[in-house]
From Swiss-Prot:
Family: To cation A.eutrophus efflux system protein CzcD.
One Pfam family linked to the record: Cation_efflux
Protein's name in the database: Uncharacterized protein in glgB 5'region
Membrane disposition: Multi-pass membrane protein
Tagged with keyword Transmembrane: yes
Transmembrane regions: 24-44, 55-75, 88-108
GO cellular component: plasma membrane
């Protein structure tokens, strides 16, 4: 009978967060840029479709901004109050984003 072997991957979480932070910044800036372009284009052309899509993209910018804040909070080291660190902020933000989408869909 062979012994049971356990393999724990102790990879640094911060390395993943740094890559995620870079990706989120790029996505946030691009989405914000296209949101502004759609608002200007919608106002200049009196297009309700462009203005509606820009409102949708503005909600995406808000969600990305919340994700960015959560990522920065999650990178804080543990302390006496939060002994496991601040990683739960990522989960709370994901829940809030999902809740916001549910409320918007009910409103539609």
């Amino acid at each position: 009978m062979s012994p049971i072997q356990y393999d724990y991957h102790h990879l640094p979480h911060v390395k993943t967060q740094n890559q995620s932070k870079k990706t989120l910044w790029i996505t946030l800036v691009l989405t914000l840029f296209f949101t502004i372009v759609e608002i200007v284009g919608g106002l200049l052309s009196n297009s309700l479709a462009l203005l509606s899509d820009s409102a949708h993209m503005a909600s995406d910018v808000l969600a990305l901004g919340l994700s960015m804040i959560a990522l920065y909070l999650a990178m804080r080291p543990p302390n006496h109050r939060f002994t496991f660190g601040y990683l739960r902020f990522e989960i709370i933000t994901s829940f809030l984003n999902g809740l916001t989408l549910a409320i918007i869909s009910i409103g539609i």
